[in-house]
Amino acid sequence: MPKIAVLPGDGIGQEIIPQAVRVLKAVLAETDAEFEFQDYPIGGAAIELVGKALPDETLQGCREADAVLLGAVGGHQWDHLPASERPETAALLGLRKGLNFYANIRPVRMIPSLLATSTLKENVLDGVDMVVIRELTGGVYFGEKGRSDNPRSAYDKMTYSEEEIRRILIQGFETAMLRSKKLCSVDKANVLETSRLWREIANELAKEYPEVELTHMYVDNAAMQLVRNPKQFDVIVTENMFGDILTDLASMLGGSIGMLSSASLSGTQGMYEPAHGSAPDIAGKNLANPLATILSAALMLRYSFGMEAEALRIESAVEKVLEQGYRTGDLAQAGDKVVGTIEMGDAVLAAL
């Protein structure tokens, strides 16, 4: 029986994960598939429970699972801890490294009924449909770092191996093959040696994918182009820090970061989570938007279990709910039906 490790985490994670699980169970109930759902603590909740953000039991449970569904981690009450012990570092980076989730996939699509929610013009956004692929376990976030005194200074080392670059670029090419056969590799090869190696390997791999149109773009230009003309992009592939920044920027192309789903893949497993954080300011108030988490559950069915029809059912239900005018506060405009977290989950279930 396939096993899903469920990690609600902190803040609104405790509210949005139950809605995604409800939707998953409803869809799976109409198939012959039987799944086991097992909850584990992570993040600040785990610190309070056992004294560490990523308990051994949680890491082992995730290793034994076929897929991981994660809510969000972090909160101001743990900011006093050393950086290496905070939920965002110890839990998220530890999980990514421990399970070798090296590829982060974030679909960005403007749903027509949400065009008015973005700060960008409708003619710029209408038709936006792209995938951003971010390398997740290398680069400056995982490099050697430190500080010295007299005078005070700090350093963070960025390193990439050929293997790390090659495997994420292959993910980019393979994804492009399934879509419009257009791949934009984003780097900073005019300044960074790691980016020059990245570009070399991308050009080498392009010979193995002659059907894919490969282009290169510097990250600063990519940020500008995502706002100026986002429809030029179909698949973007980039390194860890650049991807971290660009995916948050791209989230506004879909109306709200509350709509941005995410899949993190290894060769054998997947972890699925919304792109937003734990939002402690609205936690426990039934205000959080669960749609990114529900859409992440759809990605789980697609990537980890090959259940494309069921994934499409969830995505269609989300679109239907939005077309009916249901909105959580982050998406609300005048005249919309503003609902809470639970009510939005109810609406998606009804739309199924």
From Swiss-Prot:
Keyword Oxidoreductase set for record: yes
Quaternary state and interactors: Homodimer.
Gene Ontology cellular component terms for the protein in this record: cytosol
Organism the protein comes from: Desulfitobacterium hafniense (strain Y51)
Cofactor remark from the record: Binds 1 Mg(2+) or Mn(2+) ion per subunit.
Catalytic activity: (2R,3S)-3-isopropylmalate + NAD(+) = 4-methyl-2-oxopentanoate + CO2 + NADH
Functional note: Catalyzes the oxidation of 3-carboxy-2-hydroxy-4-methylpentanoate (3-isopropylmalate) to 3-carboxy-4-methyl-2-oxopentanoate. The product decarboxylates to 4-methyl-2 oxopentanoate.
Coiled coil: none
Family annotation (InterPro entries): IsoCit/isopropylmalate_DH_CS, IsoPropMal-DH-like_dom, Isopropylmalate_DH
Protein's UniProt name: 3-isopropylmalate dehydrogenase
Entries under SUPFAM superfamilies matching the protein: Isocitrate/Isopropylmalate dehydrogenase-like
Keywords: Amino-acid biosynthesis, Branched-chain amino acid biosynthesis, Cytoplasm, Leucine biosynthesis, Magnesium, Manganese, Metal-binding, NAD, Oxidoreductase
This protein's record includes keyword Ion transport: no
Family note: Belongs to the isocitrate and isopropylmalate dehydrogenases family. LeuB type 1 subfamily.
Gene, per the UniProt record: leuB
GO MF, one example: 3-isopropylmalate dehydrogenase activity
Residues that hold NAD(+) according to the record: G277, S278, A279, P280, D281, I282, A283, G284, K285, N286, L287, A288, N289
Binding site for substrate: R96, R106, R134, D220
Top-level division of the source organism's lineage: Bacteria
EC number of the protein: 1.1.1.85
